[in-house]
Swiss-Prot record:
Belongs to the LacAB/RpiB family. PANTHER family: GALACTOSE-6-PHOSPHATE ISOMERASE SUBUNIT LACA, RIBOSE-5-PHOSPHATE ISOMERASE B. One of its GO terms (molecular function) is galactose-6-phosphate isomerase activity. One of its GO terms (biological process) is pentose-phosphate shunt, non-oxidative branch. It is an enzyme of class 5 (isomerase). It comes from Staphylococcus haemolyticus (strain JCSC1435). This is Galactose-6-phosphate isomerase subunit LacA. It comes from the Bacteria.
Length: 142
């Protein structure tokens, strides 16, 4: 599993905090916006395109509020993403929705919460079963 992470200018500092945390916990992390000053549309699309290359990939996009990146990610065919600002939602969106990407806002969550969100998201696993019906419905919309 590779975790692709990216941010716009407003999310750079928090993205770096999360990236460092994930690397310290032995995750394979690729920063697709390192050294770049992008808006949330371009930074999110950079994450989405990498995530979609392999079913095992995950993505995290950070902007000021998380909403912009969420809107962009969910416009891409086949992408199931969630805007999260708490650990439980990050975990549940993996286990129930089979989300492969989350977005969060640097103006909404602090460093510790962002680390915990990332931890729960990457440690979550899709439960399948009764949840597959909804995932199939989402995929059928594309």
């Amino acid at each position: 599993m590779t975790i692709f992470i990216g941010s716009d200018v407003a999310g750079q500092r928090l993205k770096d905090v999360v990236k460092t945390f994930l690397k310290e916990n032995n995750h394979d992390v690729v920063d697709v916006t390192e050294g770049k000053e992008l808006d949330f549309v371009d930074s999110t699309l950079a994450v989405v395109h990498e995530v979609q290359k392999n079913d095992d990939n995950l993505g995290i996009a950070v902007d000021a509020y998380g909403a912009g990146s969420f809107i962009v990610a969910t416009k891409v065919k086949g992408m199931i993403a969630a805007e999260v600002s708490d650990e439980r939602s990050a975990y549940m969106t993996r286990s129930h929705n089979n989300a492969c990407m989350i977005t969060m806002g640097s103006e909404i969550v602090g460093d510790t919460l962002a680390k915990n969100i990332a931890k729960e998201f990457v440690n979550g696993h899709y439960d399948g079963g009764r949840h597959q019906i909804r995932v199939d419905m989402l995929n059928k919309m594309c």
